[in-house]
From Swiss-Prot:
Intracellular or extracellular location(s): Cytoplasm
Enzymatic reactions: L-histidine = trans-urocanate + NH4(+)
Protein name: Histidine ammonia-lyase
GO molecular function: histidine ammonia-lyase activity
Length: 505
């Protein structure tokens, strides 16, 4: 059980919450702050003060005063009118993450909602009632209005949810669980939908997958080094310490650990003086991607614990301030950076695939074919990899350089952070498939070199991979092999555990 405080949530905890289904509870101290802040809102309503988002309309209607008797209707109208999401729904892990992150930000005690609202969010998490939230429709400022409105709908008993493996009306799940829908009061509608929790939840899932995919890339690259009899000297610690990037040093260290007892690697000058960049520069390129991952993790953990709605309430109600914490620019930049960092892992992987299948670049059978000419072997697998990396180049175009005004030009600059976050996740799926192709080719090359000569780590990984796909003894439908390896990597490594040297043993 993870305790939410509004301040301390980490990526490691989100792994447990999103992927292992662990439950959540609220810190009592934080809940007390929520209750105290709510008292301020109720006094504002009772006194008839004019405060944006509490006793006024929204966006361009911020100058319209709402009468006390209409406050509840205002909240309901807000949620319904803003539930304009379109397209396929986010994965359940993302909508679960949205619930968790929305509750966590409210626990900071500056949003002005009742404890009842926080508790309802936590009930949905713990009972695994996950909102159906369409992926498209957010500009990333004022936060993720459309996606979060679909989240808010289910608290009211409207909209759809994923529940017990089915997509059902929210009231079906609420009734079965013995829960009553809530009626939103002053400020609560805006507090639920004004924030960055869709882009951040998708970003967290993307980061978790990206982190493990980067570890996998090192192990698969190590198999390729063996298949091409690569020069191990390029990974010498002195070389990488001389440059000074810790991530580069760490990648080189892991490669050395993986290959420490391999009989397939060579020494400088033994077969050739130096390798091509796609082998020799693995620590430099993969290490740079790790720099991106570290940056992204830092920004996500800040945003996971951020107050991102508007207005915010401070000093016991002395300050009720309209700000712009809902603007998703920090996450938009981070997700665009993640797109580039991950796409590059596929770029260099595709070049290693080319070196494995091109007979002009190695002494292996052409395209790793068992009968070159009669059988094409891995020829078109390289085509598929080339297609995926080219698609990634399009997806990697930064979403954050775009903006379009909305709400009659009141909201005249937006982040497009949710688009960036969605595209990052799509790129990661493509990267995994490219790495799957490299793994299939590297395993085949290892058979020609002699499996018994592989390192202890790569040999173990090879045997696990062969449980997913057989050797290439005849041409067959290779798309099935690629998807089998990709699914295996994702379900057994990429979102379950970090892949380090020991994970392969």
């Amino acid at each position: 059980m993870i305790t939410l405080t509004g301040h301390t949530l980490t990526i490691e905890e989100m792994k447990r919450l999103l992927l292992e289904g662990e439950g959540v509870t609220a810190c009592p101290t934080s809940m007390q702050k929520v209750a105290e802040c709510r008292e301020v809102v109720e006094k504002i309503v009772e006194d008839g003060k004019v405060v944006y988002g509490i006793t006024t309309g929204f966006g361009k209607f911020s100058d319209v005063l709402i009468q006390k008797d209409d406050v509840k209707a205002l909240q309901h109208n807000l949620i319904q009118s803003h539930a304009c999401g379109i397209g396929e729904p986010f994965p359940e892990e993302v909508s679960r993450g949205m619930l968790i992150l929305r509750a966590n930000t409210m626990l900071k005690g500056v949003s002005g909602v009742r404890p009842l609202v926080v508790n309802m969010l936590l009930e949905f998490v713990n009972r695994k009632i996950h909102p159906v939230v369409p992926q498209q429709g957010s500009l990333g400022a004022s936060g993720d209005l459309a996606p979060l409105s679909h989240l808010a709908l289910v608290l009211l008993g409207e909209g759809e949810v994923f529940y017990k493996g089915k997509r059902v009306h929210a009231m079906v799940a609420l009734t079965e669980e013995g829960l009553e829908p809530i009626e939103l009061e002053a400020k609560e509608g805006l507090a639920l939908i004004n924030g960055t929790q869709a882009m951040t939840a998708q970003g967290v899932l993307s980061y978790i997958e990206a982190e493990a995919t980067a570890y996998q890339a090192e192990l698969i690259a190590s198999m390729t080094i063996e298949g091409l009899q690569g020069i191990i000297d390029a990974f010498d610690e002195n070389v990488h310490k001389a440059r000074g990037y810790k991530e580069q040093v760490e990648v080189a260290s892991r490669i050395r650990d993986i290959l420490h007892d391999s009989k397939l690697t060579t020494k400088q000058g033994e077969l050739r003086v130096q390798d091509a960049y796609s082998l020799r520069c693995i620590p430099q390129v993969h290490g740079a991607s790790w720099q991106v991952l570290n940056y992204v993790k830092e920004k996500l953990e800040i945003e996971m614990n951020a107050a991102t709605d508007n207005p915010l309430i401070f000093d016991g109600g002395e300050k009720v301030i309209s700000g712009g914490n809902f603007h998703g620019q920090p996450i938009a930049f981070a997700m665009d950076f993640l797109k580039v960092g991950m796409a590059e892992l596929a770029n260099i992987s595709e070049r290693r695939i080319e070196r494995l299948v091109n007979p002009q670049l190695n002494d292996l059978p052409p395209f790793l074919s068992p009968e070159p000419g009669l059988q094409s072997g891995a020829m078109i697998m390289q085509y598929a990899a080339a297609s995926l990396v080219s698609e990634n180049k399009t997806l990697a175009h930064p979403a954050s350089v775009d903006s379009i005004p909305s709400s009659a030009n009141q909201e005249d600059h937006v982040s497009m952070g949710t688009i960036a976050s969605r595209h990052a996740h799509q790129i990661i799926q493509n990267v995994r498939r490219v790495l799957s192709i490299e793994m299939i080719c590297a395993m085949q090359a290892a058979e020609y070199r002699g499996i018994e000569n592989m390192s202890t780590v790569t040999k173990s990984f090879y045997h696990q991979g062969r449980q997913q796909v057989p050797s290439i003894t005849n041409d067959r439908i290779f798309s099935t092999d690629i998807e089998n390896i990709a699914h295996w990597l994702k379900t057994n490594y990429s979102i379950k555990e970090r892949l380090d040297v020991n994970a392969a043993l």
